[in-house]
Amino acid sequence: MNEPIKAKNLPLFSIIDLDQLRREKHLEGTEVTDFFTARDGKVYLLMEQPSETQGKDWLSTPSTYTAVEIQLDWAEQRVLETTLFPLGLLKFQFHYLRPAGDHFLLLGARCAYRENGPDQNAWIVSQDGAVLSRFCLGDGIQDCVVKKDGTIITSYFDEGVFGNYGWDELWVLAA
């Protein structure tokens, strides 16, 4: 039987060499937009290759995204397996990647409220980047998790007090 691992701080990027990852997986020029450790112990990175094309505003400027799933041996502090999921060129600025069953949740922290309604800053995408659904989770997102049953929990950094990006009326998001 395996001995339990005693809790200690493990500097993630001393285990995962980002420069080596970029070279070996042909991700040169990408930036780490998000990293997250899931319930199953896998580490997920959202890698972004910014586009040279400017959108009508910064929220809609397209970028090419890749989800990276890394299986670690936490006790030995080594990478066991790395899997890439190219998500393609997407016309929104995403800040969070969360596994959601066999799919991914891509989430933008900021979104605007426009004449025709709010930006859809939450996208469920397949592992090959096909957009399965889009919806709005509001502006000013601090963090998020996706529960095993698919429930999305978000926290917000400004509690909606600023009214930025056209959000000048009170909105309540409820399930």
List where the protein language model places each region.
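Blade-loop segments of beta-propeller domains
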Residues: 52-111
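A short beta-strand motif characteristic of beta-propeller blades
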Residues: 19-26, 78-88, 129-136
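Beta-propeller blade signature
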Residues: 60-74, 118-129, 168-174
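Short, conserved, GDST-rich strand-edge loop motifs in beta-rich repeat architectures
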Residues: 47-62, 107-117, 154-173
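Hydrophobic beta-strand positions that form the internal "hydrophobic ladder"
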Residues: 43, 104-105, 152-153
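Recognizes the extracellular SEMA beta-propeller fold with strongest preference
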Residues: 100, 106-127
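Sequence/structural signature of beta-propeller modules
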Residues: 1-74
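Repeated scaffold domains used in trafficking and secretory/extracellular systems
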Residues: 26-40, 86-101, 136-149, 175
